[in-house]
Amino acid sequence: MSEPRGKKTHDDMWDSGTQGLITRIAVVAALAGLLFGFDTGVISGALDYIGDAFNLGDIGKSAVVSSVLLGAVVGSIVAMAIIDRIGRRRSLIASGAVFIVGSIASAVAPGVGALDIARLLLGVAIGISAVAAPMYITEIAPAARRGQLVSFFQLMITIGILVAYVNDEAFSSNGQW
C-alpha cells in the first residue's frame, strides 16, 4: 500500500534534512555503550589497589569484578519490564541516573560490601542500557542507515573499554604486569 500523497515517510524525513539530527541523537544514545565499556574495563586497573585497601583475597576480588555482571543480568530483566512501560528514551535516562549513582557510590565506598553494591548498581545500568540503547536507535533510524547507526553502540562499548585501559595505564604506579 502506498503512502497518501503529501505524507512523508520515515525515510523521506531522513532525506529532507534531519540526517544530522538523527545521527547526533543516535551517537548520544550510543554513549550508554561508552559507559558500559568503561565501567566493565576500569576495574582491571583498580583491582590490585582495591585488594590492598580492603585486604581482599582472590575470592573477594572476584566478587568485586563479577558483581557488575550480576547487576547486568538484573538490569536486562528490569529493562524487559520497564522499556515498554516508560519508553526507550526514559529508560536510557533512568539508566544514566543509575550510572551516576553507581559511579559515585563506587568512588566513596567505605568497604568491600558497599563497593559490591555500587558495582551491582553499575551492572543494572549496563543491563538496562544494553537493551534500551540499541532499541531506541533502531526506532529513530531510517531503514537505509539503521545498521550503521546501531553499530555506534557496539563501537562505543569498545571505545569505553579502550578509554578504561588507557585510564588504568595512566594511573598505574609502574609499567609492569
Predicted features along the sequence, with ranges:
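Transmembrane-helix signature of 12-pass secondary carriers
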Residues: S2-W177
